[in-house]
Amino acid sequence: GKPMLWHLINRLRQTSGIDEISVAKSILKENDVIENFCKSEKLFCYRGSEEDVLTRTLESLEAHDADVGVIVYGDNPLVDPVVVDEVIDFYKVNREYDWVGNDLLTTFPAGMEVEVFNIGALLDSSNRETDPSIREHGTLHIRQNPNTYSLWNIEAEGVRRRPDLHLGVDVGEDLEVVRMIMKHFSNGAVFRLEDIIEYLDRNPQLPLRNRNVHRRWRKYRQSL
């Protein structure tokens, strides 16, 4: 099969709101294979600090002269391009916000995280934040300071409101679940979050495989 990153990039290419895709990885030797993959896919790959993700993100965006950044995480190969565009579209219409995303409060399934933000706000957060454990999480300083920055969280509605599901890949159990989903939808048709949820609800044993995994990111987020 194709690498996880290929599936993610393929889904991001179905969005209408993203102008350019940049893969931001660290300078560690183990990421050379990702840089080579990016070259084969004609993608821009920025290599920066391993620990300081805030600086790496900022430099990657500055290399494109971007004024707005969109973050989608590399371990979320099932992210829905429609969800990505919804967050981008909300930001475009509501420019008074420094940051718009769907992960301040977890209402979507994990693995659907999208953040859109003003580069000026990210630069400001970089100038203010000195704690390496905060800088390691990119936009975390912005998300933790609602009195400094104007934030908006987009909540999932209807069938998409499933914070109990985990569609990202943190551990081996997650990879099993994601592979089963991809295998089910391997006929090449574009599949959306609603389709994934319907499939998991018809196969309830599958989401149980990774339901009880300890998630480090939960301490940085509110959950319902």
Question: What is each residue range found by the language model?
Answer:
Residues G1-K25, E30:
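N-terminal glycine-rich phosphate-binding loop and ensuing alpha1 helix
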Residues E30-K39:
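Acidic helix N-cap motif at the loop->helix transition within catalytic regions
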Residues K39-E51, E62:
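Conserved donor nucleotide-binding strand/loop of the catalytic core
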Residues A66, V114-S126, G172-E176:
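Conserved nucleotide-sugar donor-binding
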Residues G69-V70:
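Short aromatic/hydrophobic "clamp" motif used to bind/position activated sugar donors
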Residues D80-T107:
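Conserved donor-nucleotide/metal-binding helix-loop-beta segment in metal-dependent transferases, i.e.
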Residues G138-L224:
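Conserved alpha/beta core of the MobA/IspD/sugar-nucleotide pyrophosphorylase nucleotidyltransferase superfamily
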